[in-house]
Regions:
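Cell-wall polysaccharide-cleaving catalytic domain and substrate-binding groove, primarily
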Residues: 1-84, 89-157
């Protein structure tokens, strides 16, 4: 994760004009973030980052480095033209990702720490799977560094 900075974009590629204009994702609507992400990906493609599967491009934004911001917001029932991509919204969206990974099942004891951990690693590229590797390692963009297994075991106790 990005250290909980709610207004950042992925730092591998920089679009100087965006930073010069003073954009801050936390003050933008979901639609504006989606448009910026799309423009950002297209800009990277124009620079020659053009793999067939797009693994060499990213427009991850916010504290949790989210990609499918608009799709997630819509599935959560947000009005994407009015909802800001601020701390409150990002935290709610992170909860959504936790639940996609099985948080409620883990909390109820229906899945193991390892199963939950590995599902989280799919949602959050910074988290290592129980095997020690990230679900997205080797994609040219990500490298997992966080081992949360000890934390999950501690929370379970």
């Amino acid at each position: 994760m990005s250290g909980y900075i709610y207004c950042i974009t992925n730092s591998k590629y920089k679009i100087d004009d965006i930073y010069k204009l003073g954009y801050t994702a936390a003050k933008m609507t979901i639609d504006e973030v989606h448009d910026l992400q799309t423009d950002y990906l297209n800009h990277q493609k124009a620079l020659g980052y053009d793999s067939a599967d797009g693994h060499d491009r990213s427009a991850a934004m916010g504290a949790y480095q989210m990609m499918e911001v608009k799709a997630v917001a819509q599935s959560m029932g947000f009005d994407t033209s009015k909802t800001l991509f601020n701390k409150e919204t990002q935290d709610k969206m992170a909860d959504y990702y936790l639940n996609i990974a099985g948080y409620q099942q883990w909390k109820a004891g229906k899945i193991s720490d390892q199963q939950f951990n590995d599902a989280l690693a799919i949602q959050f590229a910074s988290i290592k799977k129980a095997s020690g590797k990230g679900a997205h390692d080797g994609d040219g963009m990500n490298n997992a560094y966080g081992n949360i297994m000890p934390l999950l075991k501690q929370l379970r106790e």
